[in-house]
Amino acid sequence: MNPIVKSFEYGQHTVTLETGVIARQADAAVLASMGDTTVLVTVVGKKEADAGRDFFPLTVNYQEKTYAAGKIPGGFFKREGRPSEDETLIARLIDRPIRPLFPNGFKNEVQVIITVVSVDPQIEPDIISMIGTSAALAISGIPFSGPLGAARVGYIDGEYVLNPSVAQLATSQLNLVVAGTAGAVLMVESEAQALPEEVMLGSVVYGHDQQQVVIKAIAEFKAEAGKPTWDWTAPTQDADLVAQIKELAEAGLGDAYKIQVKQDRYAQVSVVKAATKEALLASNPSIDLREVDNLLGSLEKKVVRGRIIRGEPRIDGREPDMIRALSVLAGVLPRTHGSALFTRGETQALVTCTLGTERDAQKIDSIMGERTNRFMLHYNFPPYSVGETGMVGSPKRREIGHGKLAWRGINAVMPSAAEFPYSVRVVSEITESNGSSSMASVCGTSLALMDAGVPIKTSVAGIAMGLVKEGDDFVVLSDILGDEDHLGDMDFKVAGTRDGITALQMDIKIEGITKEIMDIALQQAYGARVHILNVMDQAIGSHRDDISDHAPRITVIKINPEKIRDVIGKGGAVIRALTEETGTTIELEDDGTVKIASSNGEATKEAIRRIEEITSEVEVGRIYNGKVIRIVDFGAFVNILPGKDGLVHISQISDERVANVSDHLELNQEVAVKVMEVDRQGRVRLSIKEAQTKEAAAAE
């Protein structure tokens, strides 16, 4: 074994790339480290494409092993199971920038597996995973237009920070990941605290500049460890067939793309394509229809893009910066805690908000440690939303990714636990889709939260931008349709408030996207965002003054932390009885905070009364109504508060001489007693006769 190692300084850490020792039967394997966080990246590609395949089968699997953090998995089987949400999101983060770097026409199956084998709790594994993937693909020999660099950018005290630690991210106003080649940004994913457009653009440029050291190092690593590039050539097009298809279909496709209703447009496009195939088969029965489909797709793309570059109206008749018609409704469902229906053109989201207690929060145990998520946002994309049939079940990668993007857009305006002690779950059901459904989810979530009475700081809206670029000519499109996303060069999603950006996601399919183009897109997105916010605010401009009658109401009280054990009781008996008998949910915190949740106000009051009784201190000189719980020869024990008993000595039962306690008192008898003393050991001395004397005096 002859290891080849490349090390370089990157931000606050040393990055090391090593190959030649582990997983030597893979086409490429790189052990990549950043500090103590280490990942093993393997790449395997098939030398031949499967016959009849018309797509590129790239699979990226990212897996976190609990042994990397010195943990044993939970559950019955004590081993890792299905991918977590975090693993799914990081797999998508790696997939998105590498996919456009494989050549057009390359349809060989490629699988990338990233395994986290060691983790430093202060260094997240996503950036080193992207760097390791780039290095492994670079040395594999598989056709790949890399190397690719990656960087995380924070913004702390007005300064950009390269690859901030987990502790630094806690104080950062920005968490942005940018990936790209030496000459182009390909992918951006970020969450921000309503930062201005110029700060966001600056962070993208900063991250791309800083990652040049990674790209240079991987190029040097490839020169030393790279395998010969595969002998692969892109399939050639039949020029005569291209000309035939253009003659048969170009005019028809141009007319079809003037139809503004999506389903009608798709139907007409299908008619044109079917007629073209029929004509071609008539002249050549042995023609390859898969090749015809590919060439029709290329012509379709050329027709749509040409119209936009020439300044003609878009597919649905809009100008480049126009937003589709908006419809905004809040409070559309009677029994949910909050709801909204947001419609933008042919994209629609039905969004609901549900309030719960702290125990309803999501508990996440990952290799980076345990955390609690009080705000959850789930995105569902059923097949009927695009007029199709399909499987319905657990969320797919795309649904998880879109939900997380919408979550990032809203999280910056959510109230703290001290301001609003509820767990919040939002569900966005995409009921119609023609582009930008994740941004419709952002708008619908903002509305549903306000309808539920959640005191978010301000409204949030999202917009998806697109780009068509031919040579030096380009057009930035606002509020793109699904077709414009598919046929364009960029998908640029921006969510934010009037004051700034809260989430930014960008995927670019071509090189040559300049800072100028990104700046134009951000400024155009700002105008669109403000327009949408104005319409949203007409429906509901601020949160409801009160939460829904159907939502649990949480009342917060404070008790002496030393009394927590009294409220819990032996084996949890006291708190269990409290919750069962009052019908409330009670949560205790170590600092003495008690949260009582119930949709019944009287039940909450009863729970508070009983907790106050349990936790109250015995006051010397005060008269209590107690119950006799035990009789002994020298007196009786009386319960005056939950868990608080005292002794009435035989001499304190009556002014008269008492020979037998049972002649004056019986078990479960209610008596008024006065607290005479509480000694250092907490023992309580009571008197019945003193209580009677005091009551008599008060009566006079």
Swiss-Prot record:
PROSITE patterns the UniProt entry points to: KH_TYPE_1, S1
CDD domains in the record: KH-I_PNPase, RNase_PH_PNPase_1, RNase_PH_PNPase_2, S1_PNPase
Keyword Magnesium: yes
Domain KH: 552-611
Catalyses which reaction(s): RNA(n+1) + phosphate = RNA(n) + a ribonucleoside 5'-diphosphate
Cofactor section: Mg(2+)
Subcellular location, record wording: Cytoplasm
Residues annotated as domain S1 motif: 621-689
GO terms for MF: 3'-5'-RNA exonuclease activity; magnesium ion binding; polyribonucleotide nucleotidyltransferase activity; RNA binding
Top-level taxonomic group: Bacteria
GO CC annotation, single: cytosol
Binding site for Mg(2+): 485, 491
Keyword terms: Cytoplasm, Magnesium, Metal-binding, Nucleotidyltransferase, RNA-binding, Transferase
EC number in record: 2.7.7.8
Coiled coil: none
Biological process, per Gene Ontology: mRNA catabolic process; RNA processing
Database matches in PANTHER family: POLYRIBONUCLEOTIDE NUCLEOTIDYLTRANSFERASE (PTHR11252), POLYRIBONUCLEOTIDE NUCLEOTIDYLTRANSFERASE 1, MITOCHONDRIAL (PTHR11252:SF0)
Record family assignment: Belongs to the polyribonucleotide nucleotidyltransferase family.
Function according to Swiss-Prot or TrEMBL: Involved in mRNA degradation. Catalyzes the phosphorolysis of single-stranded polyribonucleotides processively in the 3'- to 5'-direction.
Self-association and partners: Component of the RNA degradosome, which is a multiprotein complex involved in RNA processing and mRNA degradation.
Descriptive protein name: Polyribonucleotide nucleotidyltransferase
Upper classification of the organism: Bacteria, Pseudomonadati, Pseudomonadota, Gammaproteobacteria, Alteromonadales
The encoding gene: pnp
